[in-house]
Amino acid sequence: MFINKIGYSHLEKGLNNQDYGFIHNNLKGIVDGCSEGLHSEVGAKLFCHKYEDLGCPIVSTKDYFNVLFNSNIINNKPDSIKNFLLFTILFVEELEEHFVVYSCGDGIIIKQKHDDILEYEVIEQNNKPKYYAYNYIPEEYLSDYKNGVNFDLRYYKKDEYKSIGIASDGLQYILNSDFKEEFEKSLINRKEFAIKRLINREHKLFKDDITIAF
């Protein structure tokens, strides 16, 4: 199940949806563009589409952005990287005995237990999310993460969890709302359109874009 909706504040300001993502076989991915990047929504979508074109080789692909640089769509100069490639990345991979979450930046992990109880793990970075793009920017241009960034890995055993999903930090507006129970019922039953209708109905509450891969 994949949901991607623009935040109300972006509509008010005339901005595009800066979130994107995909579901490809046993891999789910979500990216959340930085509002300071002039065209981060373009880079986010290009990254997802190009990454899917590669077959989503999460284990073997270490240099995630070279596929964009080599395609001559985006160059690797600092200004171009800042304008197009500042976005957080969340992956969740389903393996035989466990789920693996790869994170570079903030977001929310949705954990469904076998009794259908939902748990949420918020990845906080104190408003200083680490963007994978920082690995390609000379340190003199950076105020944080001058030594580069890596993905953080989290493992969840399948004998404890039925499913693991991921979401951009826009999900926080649901978790702190009066309709959280309504949302969770639809999520557990994989009712994608019901969740989209809920977000449309309460759209003014959702200041930020929201993307869910579950």
Language-model features: where?
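PP2C/PPM family metal-dependent serine/threonine protein phosphatase catalytic domain
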Residues: 2-15, 70-80, 111-157, 197-205
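N-terminal entry segment of metal-dependent catalytic domains or homologous docking segments
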Residues: 1-53, 107, 146, 154-155, ...
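Short helix/loop capping segments that flank catalytic or ligand/cofactor-binding pockets
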Residues: 38-40, 111-112, 174-176
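Solvent-exposed, amphipathic alpha-helical segments
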Residues: 46-57, 181-186
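C-terminal catalytic subdomain
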Residues: 76-79, 84, 94, 141-214
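Catalytic core of PPM/PP2C metal-dependent serine/threonine phosphatase domains
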Residues: 56-112, 145-158
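Short hydrophobic beta-strand that contains or immediately precedes a catalytic carboxylate
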Residues: 28-32, 102-104, 165-167
